[in-house]
């Protein structure tokens, strides 16, 4: 069975750079990796095919032999059959930085339509922006369709000519005894067309790099890790193929007051010693402004008060989270002599009273006494 063209397997052009080869390989290796396609023999075969194509095109000597003689040229270097070595060792350095899905679009010889690559943009948001939603202007470098040559790659007023060797197929047939093997056409390098007078703007590629400005609408309630897909906003396709997609990845920055946990918000609210002991009504911050919170008498530090529907509205439903206010009783500092005397008097009154004024402290002392009694027995 004849092997497929390596450039076709990776979905790249024959003048692809080393970076483009690796990018295509990482995307397809992730798509067909056995860990994700367990039990699917057809996808495992594709995975092996992708790996073999990359091993050839990533090696300058093998690539040169392949470009001139096809798979036979590589085999003559002593490569032999496909190396089915351990997958984990082969790809351990790759899966950590992969994003986006597998590449779609054409394969085969000639100038067939090929979908453009997907792009990713990391967007930083404040908590307020994430909770309320916002439209933001972004700028992304991308490959765009060349309007000068209308994507043909040929200079305006000229056109690419059909290759006279492969007659536009991008492949030629080479016979070896009883067998016929298809390989990339050496004249047009598998393109099926020859551009004798390339476009000055895109240099014959039909696309060129340009920064694109666009507005992205962020819905209310997004959180770190959420991703928005903008269809058709990725790199322009080749040979009339559709554009890829743009994925906007959210990263919500830390807030100086609130800490987010899903749709709930948490904050710490300082209260005075007297407010905790006697009770009070205080103001606490929310994303919609200040609201009043009633602190009952004898409130201990660390107590959490739940304020219903003062959190974040879910981006996936109509439910709204809560605001969890944790009160922290502050110890008074920089006391005057009179204040010190009053506190000492207060402590004396508490100590002489039979009423338990410090439930946690007295419970702790009881536990300590029991502990030492057990040790001595």
Curated annotation (Swiss-Prot):
CXXCXGXG motif repeats: 146-153, 163-170, 185-192, 199-206
GO BP terms: chaperone cofactor-dependent protein refolding; DNA replication; protein refolding; response to heat
The keyword Zinc-finger is assigned to this record: yes
Cofactor: Zn(2+)
A Pfam match: DnaJ_C
Annotated residues for binding of Zn(2+) 1: 146, 149, 199, 202
Keyword Metal-binding: yes
Record domain J: where: 5-70
Segment forming the signal sequence: none
Record localization: Cytoplasm
Assembly description: Homodimer.
Annotated domain remarks: The J domain is necessary and sufficient to stimulate DnaK ATPase activity. Zinc center 1 plays an important role in the autonomous, DnaK-independent chaperone activity of DnaJ. Zinc center 2 is essential for interaction with DnaK and for DnaJ activity.
Family note: Belongs to the DnaJ family.
Name by which UniProt lists this protein: Chaperone protein DnaJ
Lineage: Bacteria, Pseudomonadati, Pseudomonadota, Gammaproteobacteria, Alteromonadales
Gene coding for it: dnaJ
């Amino acid at each position: 069975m004849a092997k497929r063209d390596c450039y076709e397997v990776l979905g790249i052009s024959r003048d692809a750079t080393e970076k483009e080869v690796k990018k295509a390989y990482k995307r397809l290796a992730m798509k067909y990796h056995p860990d994700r396609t367990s039990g699917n023999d057809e996808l495992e075969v594709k995975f092996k095919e992708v790996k073999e194509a990359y091993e050839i095109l990533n090696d300058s000597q093998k690539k040169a032999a392949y470009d001139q003689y096809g798979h036979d040229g590589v085999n003559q270097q002593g490569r032999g059959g496909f190396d089915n070595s351990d997958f984990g060792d082969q790809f351990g350095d790759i899966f950590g930085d992969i994003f986006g899905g597998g590449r779609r679009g054409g394969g085969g010889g000639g100038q067939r339509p090929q979908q453009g690559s997907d792009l990713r943009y990391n967007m930083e948001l404040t908590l307020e922006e994430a909770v309320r939603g916002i439209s933001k202007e972004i700028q992304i470098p991308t490959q765009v369709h060349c309007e000068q040559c209308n994507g043909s790659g040929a200079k305006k007023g000229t056109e690419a000519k059909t290759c006279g060797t492969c007659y536009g197929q991008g492949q030629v047939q080479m016979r070896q005894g009883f067998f016929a093997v298809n390989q990339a056409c050496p004249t047009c390098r598998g393109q099926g067309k020859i551009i004798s007078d390339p476009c000055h703007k895109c240099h014959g590629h039909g696309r060129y790099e340009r920064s694109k400005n666009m507005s992205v609408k962020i819905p209310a309630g997004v959180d770190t890790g959420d991703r928005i897909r903008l269809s058709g906003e990725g790199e322009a396709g080749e040979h009339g193929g559709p554009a890829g997609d743009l994925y906007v990845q959210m990263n919500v920055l830390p807030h100086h007051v609130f800490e987010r946990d899903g749709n709930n918000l948490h904050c710490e609210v300082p209260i005075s010693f007297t407010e905790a002991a006697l009770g009070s009504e205080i103001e606490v911050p929310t994303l919609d402004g200040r609201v009043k919170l009633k602190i009952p008498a004898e409130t201990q530090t660390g107590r959490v008060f739940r304020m219903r529907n003062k959190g974040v509205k879910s981006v996936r439903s109509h439910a709204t989270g809560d605001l969890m206010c944790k009160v922290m009783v502050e110890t008074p500092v920089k006391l005057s002599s009179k204040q010190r005397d009053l506190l000492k008097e207060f402590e004396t009154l508490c100590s002489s009273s039979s009423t338990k004024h410090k439930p946690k402290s007295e419970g702790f002392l009881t536990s300590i006494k029991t502990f030492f009694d057990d040790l001595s027995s």
